[in-house]
Swiss-Prot record:
Cytoplasm as UniProt keyword: yes
Entry EC number(s): 6.3.4.19
Single GO term (MF): tRNA(Ile)-lysidine synthase activity
First-level EC class: ligase
Entry comment, domain topic: The N-terminal region contains the highly conserved SGGXDS motif, predicted to be a P-loop motif involved in ATP binding.
InterPro entries: Lysidine-tRNA-synth_C (IPR012796), Rossmann-like_a/b/a_fold (IPR014729), TilS/TtcA_N (IPR011063), tRNA_Ile_lys_synt (IPR012094), tRNA_Ile_lys_synt_N (IPR012795)
Protein name: tRNA(Ile)-lysidine synthase
GO biological process, one term: tRNA modification
Residues at which ATP binds: 28-33
Pfam families in the cross-refs: ATP_bind_3, TilS_C
Keywords associated with the record: ATP-binding, Cytoplasm, Ligase, Nucleotide-binding, tRNA processing
Catalysed reaction equations from the record: cytidine(34) in tRNA(Ile2) + L-lysine + ATP = lysidine(34) in tRNA(Ile2) + AMP + diphosphate + H(+)
SMART domains tied to this protein: TilS_C
Length: 448
């Protein structure tokens, strides 16, 4: 099957081969989008959908206005409807400009889609884009589902976002443009290897292609296999989850704990996402799962984030929304530590535990695997810290010795490990440690 036949088949599968359908085509004037527009124009009149061209001038390059002028002239000659939008320099952020530009661009596409009652937005992502994205995400790390890559089709605005050129390589697009005399513009910023994607595009991918010229196909095959496996996993988790929740949606600890260990995290993650309508990373989920698997104490609370907490009682775990408290009050339950994140634990204190030295005053501290999960909580009667030489000191005595007023003592927070041992009386004193398996940096910021 030729690439053009694949293109036509994909449009047919999306039910777009009809003059009664309207599609929005995102056109930048680069070779990818100009070929996409040309392919649509080549469709037989009886099958060709109504085409609305959407173009965003980001005003990031001097060449941008020339490209916009050319596209305006081209659409007039071809009798195509053109909608143009300007992302003016005054709206450009000082940092994160690429992400902000993408957000503006897709906001425009959604608006054009609604105004023209279009069924789909078509973009010109291709096989090389797919490989570049795959390698970038592989290098950055994260959830394995991210390696499934750019989806051929997904819900978007009032219809779908479709990428019909994902099976085309960049070379195929260039060859098609040359054969069909398609005029396009080269974005000079695509040559800037200071940008991560451009380094991968110009250095990494060509080198890998010398190892195996079938790189694009092999990555696409891996992504399809991964998609199939993740779909099967999702179906299995749905079945298992139905066996371990109550009619009210609570997680039954014994039944969940009886699942094979490799399924407990996946089932817990899906349950929590359904309860909160939020997504969580595996690093965030692992301590929650460890807390849920403990049998003591029988009744316990654990803060997930600013909006949700977990409550375990009578053999079940519930996800409960946190009621807003007054600014000067602090939570009376535990707050789970998020590694490498600042966390506000009182009205005036923000703390963090970092694996690298932060840009504020910090205290190096030894941790072990057994310490996790760590939590912040108000100090309690009986809490004590380890002193140099092996002795201990009650937190209550420490605060009295430091002449902390009684009304302020209640606001003092401590960092405790999984065994309940105090590692840090925040703002006052650290427990003494000289060994461990991991060095972290404990930091505190005061706010008025």
């Amino acid at each position: 099957m030729t690439p053009i036949q694949k293109f036509n088949r994909q449009l047919a599968a999306a039910k777009l081969l009809s003059p009664q359908q309207t599609v929005v085509v995102a056109v930048s004037t680069g070779v990818d989008s100009m070929v996409l527009l040309h392919l649509l124009q080549r469709l037989p009149a009886a099958e060709r959908p109504r085409v609305v061209v959407a173009h965003v001038n980001h005003h990031l390059r001097e060449q941008s206005q020339m490209e916009a002028d050319y596209l305006r002239q081209y659409c007039q000659q071809q009798n195509l409807k053109l909608v143009m939008a300007d992302w003016l320099p005054a709206a450009h952020p000082k940092s994160g400009i690429e992400a902000a530009g993408r957000q503006f661009r897709y906001h425009v596409f959604a608006k054009v889609m609604r105004e023209n009652r279009a069924t789909a937005v078509l973009t010109a992502h291709h096989a090389n884009d797919q490989v570049e994205t795959y390698l970038m995400k592989l290098a950055r790390g994260g959830d394995i589902s991210q390696l499934t890559g750019i989806a051929t089709s997904r819900p978007f605005a009032t219809g779908r976002l479709i990428r019909p050129l994902l099976t085309w390589s960049k070379d195929q697009l260039r060859n098609y443009a040359a054969e069909q005399h398609v005029v396009y513009f080269e974005d000079v910023t695509n040559q800037d290897v200071a940008l991560t994607r451009n380094r991968i595009r110009h250095r990494v991918v060509p080198e890998l292609m010398t190892v195996n010229p079938q790189l694009l196909k092999h990555v696409a095959d891996y992504q399809q296999q991964l998609t199939t496996l993740l779909t099967a996993k999702k179906q299995m988790v749905t079945v298992l989850l139905s066996q371990v929740v109550t009619a009210t949606g609570a997680l039954v600890v014994d039944q969940w704990g009886a699942l094979p260990s490799q399924w407990q995290l996946a089932v817990f993650a899906t349950w929590l996402e359904q309860q909160t309508q939020q997504l969580f990373t595996e690093s965030k989920l692992q301590p929650l799962v460890s807390w849920g698997q403990r049998t003591r104490p029988a009744t316990s609370r654990l803060t997930v984030n600013a909006a949700w907490e977990l409550y375990r009682n009578a053999g079940i775990i519930e996800a409960l929304p946190i009621k807003k408290r007054g600014k000067k009050l602090m939570p009376r339950e535990k707050i789970m530590v998020d590694l490498n994140q600042w966390q506000k634990i009182t009205a005036t204190q923000t703390v963090g535990i970092f694996t690298r030295v932060p840009n504020v005053v910090s205290q190096p501290f030894w941790l072990t695997e057994a310490d996790w999960p760590l939590v912040w909580r108000p100090w309690q009667a009986g809490d004590r810290i380890v002193l140099k030489g092996g002795g201990h000191q009650l937190v209550r005595r420490l605060l009295i010795d430091r002449k902390v007023p009684a009304e302020r003592r209640e606001q003092v927070q401590v960092l405790v490990n999984a065994q309940g041992n105090v590692l840090w009386v925040v703002g006052h004193k650290f427990s003494y440690r000289t060994t461990g398996t991991q060095t972290v940096f404990l930091a505190l910021k005061h706010e008025s």
